[in-house]
């Protein structure tokens, strides 16, 4: 999975924690997006 697709899956910062576990770099991308 790419970081781009991870960003789409993350949604708002308040919701990404409830999504399917991400790789550390993907989690960081979510927080920054």
Swiss-Prot record:
GO terms for molecular function: RNA-directed RNA polymerase activity. The polymerase complex is composed of four chains, the three other proteins of the complex (alpha, gamma, and delta chains) are supplied by the host cell. Keywords: Nucleotidyltransferase, RNA-directed RNA polymerase, Transferase. The lineage of its organism: Viruses, Riboviria, Orthornavirae, Lenarviricota, Leviviricetes. Its EC number is 2.7.7.48. This is RNA-directed RNA polymerase beta chain. It catalyses: RNA(n) + a ribonucleoside 5'-triphosphate = RNA(n+1) + diphosphate. This enzyme is part of the viral RNA-dependent RNA polymerase complex. It comes from the Viruses.
């Amino acid at each position: 999975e790419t970081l781009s697709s991870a960003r789409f899956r993350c949604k708002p910062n308040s919701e990404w924690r409830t999504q399917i576990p991400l790789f550390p770099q993907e989690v960081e991308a979510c927080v920054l997006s």
